[in-house]
Curated annotation (Swiss-Prot):
HAMAP family: tRNA_dimethyltr_TRM1. This is tRNA (guanine(26)-N(2))-dimethyltransferase. Keywords: Methyltransferase, RNA-binding, S-adenosyl-L-methionine, Transferase, tRNA processing, tRNA-binding. GO terms for biological process: tRNA N2-guanine methylation. Belongs to the class I-like SAM-binding methyltransferase superfamily. Trm1 family.
Amino acid sequence: MKIISEGETKLMVPEESTLSKKDTVFYNPVMETNRDISVSVVQSFLDNFKRDEFLMCDPLGGSGARGIRYANELKFNGELKVSIGDINPSAVKMIKENLKLNELENVEVFHEDANVLLSKNFKIFNVVDLDPFGSPVPYLDSGIRASLTKGGLLCMTATDTAVLCGAYRKTCIRKYNAIPLKGDKELAVRLMIGYAVKMASKYDIGLKPIFSHVTDHYARTFMVTERGAGKADSAIENLGYIRQDSEQKSFKTFEEGYEKGYAGPFYLGEISDKNIVQNSLETAKNRNYSKRAIDILELISKESKIEQVGCFDIHELCSFIKKLVPPVNDIMENLKENGFKVSRVHYNPYGLKTDAELSDLVVLISEYHSKKY
């Protein structure tokens, strides 16, 4: 074992974490950025929370890193309580050791299956955070029901992004009841949100995303639960279908059914709230969280100001129109000079969000080459 620091928290973790070994406690240091962002986003949500008690659940605890950081780092004037569960007895033991290490008394630990723990706490938690290895689908129904408090928050990670991005089409249809589309990674999180919205609607619950990102090998979203059939209907109205036009390489929305060449349903509404993003960014900066977390939040802050599903990949576009790829910064400047909004995206170094049309980009790139060569 070794002791490390994440954010403002000390953690005892295994020297090596190997999933193939039976009874091994899993800790993933690569996900520190994920946890930095998560604490920042939940803090932003908590800043507007009006009740005296705030109850959270991390039902897939592992080493306890996520739940313990919530318990230790979230600032709240009322009573903050965190429930952490894991089916692995070695994980439960490590979580308890980490509680002692941080001198925390506001955490309850459960040696229990995640679905059992959530089902026992129907409508109890203000926040449920599903962070599994793989797909969140097996835990989603019980996670939704456990977070049905008024204005609850459901956080969800999927590490099966190859499935969500279309590499395994049949698996995606089977697990998410949706047809994936290869290409833009943002569509992975939009497909995941779309599935969650459909799941919640059967309980007359609407889900409203307030923050989403696609980083490394995972997609992640935070959704507020809103009660009532009307709220569920409003959420469903944001579902739609997308077709990647083989001639123009553009995305087009389609609202009715599966037709040849169309994929979905995807959530086509806003997936990150501008105020939540900005407040999360300020929290991450004030607490000196990892530079990478801050960089991602800064990019999402800019992205969230432009209403566009997905992005334009400049490499892909130039390949299609048979032009050399100009410096991305030059294209951005040209767009701004022509009155368009534009931002880089956090998940693709060659991706741009803009209110310009595809035809505008083609013209600007062609003009750039005519002036340069």
